[in-house]
């Protein structure tokens, strides 16, 4: 697979997942001293409400979004050196973190901080279910407590990985889109990670031209259960990403274009009429 400047570095996702996992597993130390499993849920909720925990969640979110923003700017600079929209791109980059780009930047930080802050509450719900199951099975309170503490690292790791994988991609798509549309570029090429793990409903989207304002429902296009309409990278567990169309000469026509609810093969002239 050839290098693509718009593809997010996997290290950002890994670092984010590890940081979230470390933060959540740090709460486990407070749980080890509890004698009763019935105190675990209330303790987790109490710890999650502490200002220190909330500040740490905000710091992790800001670190991830800032790293993505920095990498995204580098990608746009590379695009400016090559594409026909170079002057417009440079002009936009000179504005820095202002306008709608700043709004999106702050929204992404707030959203991610909220996801991390709510993670202990999700774990608390899981703990409640484990306690109820243990009680129904007639297990001793001490055994239920030990079982919960044994599973806690696995739960926190799984949740951390899901948040990191989903939210880093969503943030990348949001940052790419807001910059593209500030320049006046509404079209992009849907790119997949081009490996065996690409879901079937996304593999047929590879290379298709999409308008950011009119995203497809990839599942509906192949008669599968729909998760709604969304852009590349903008749904759970998705590793796809948008490659902004900065130069129409980069596209070999006829080309696949998503338009009017379907994927169509279009000539250059046909595409120019809807562009």
Residue ranges and their predicted role:
Residues 1-155, 246-275:
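N-terminal leader/targeting and assembly helices and adjacent pre-domain segments
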Residues 154-258:
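Acidic, glycine-rich two-metal-ion catalytic cores of nucleic acid-processing enzymes
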């Amino acid at each position: 697979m050839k290098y693509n400047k718009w593809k997010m570095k996997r290290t950002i996702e890994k670092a984010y997942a590890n940081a979230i996992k470390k933060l959540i597993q740090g709460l486990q130390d407070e749980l080890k001293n509890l004698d009763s499993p019935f105190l675990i849920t209330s303790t987790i909720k109490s710890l999650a409400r502490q200002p220190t925990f909330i500040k740490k969640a905000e710091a992790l979110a800001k670190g991830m979004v800032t790293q993505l923003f920095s990498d995204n700017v580098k990608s746009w600079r590379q695009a400016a050196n090559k594409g026909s929209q170079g002057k417009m791109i440079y002009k936009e980059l000179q504005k820095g973190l202002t306008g709608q780009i700043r709004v999106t930047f702050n929204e992404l930080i707030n959203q991610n901080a909220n996801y991390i802050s709510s993670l202990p509450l999700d774990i608390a719900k899981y703990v409640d279910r484990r306690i109820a199951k243990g009680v129904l099975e007639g297990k001793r309170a001490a055994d239920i407590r030990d079982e919960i503490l044994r599973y806690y690292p696995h739960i926190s790791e799984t949740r951390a990985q899901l948040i990191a994988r989903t939210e880093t991609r969503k943030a990348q798509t949001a940052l790419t889109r807001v910059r593209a549309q500030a320049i006046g570029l509404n079209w992009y090429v849907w790119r997949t990670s081009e490996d065996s793990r690409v879901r079937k409903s996304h593999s047929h989207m590879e290379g298709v031209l999409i308008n950011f304002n009119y995203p497809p429902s990839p599942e509906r296009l192949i008669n599968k259960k729909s998760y709604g309409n969304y852009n590349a990278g903008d749904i759970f567990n998705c590793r796809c990403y948008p490659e902004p169309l900065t130069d129409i000469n980069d596209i070999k026509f006829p080309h696949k274009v998503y338009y009017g609810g379907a994927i169509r093969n279009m000539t250059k002239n046909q595409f120019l009429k809807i562009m």
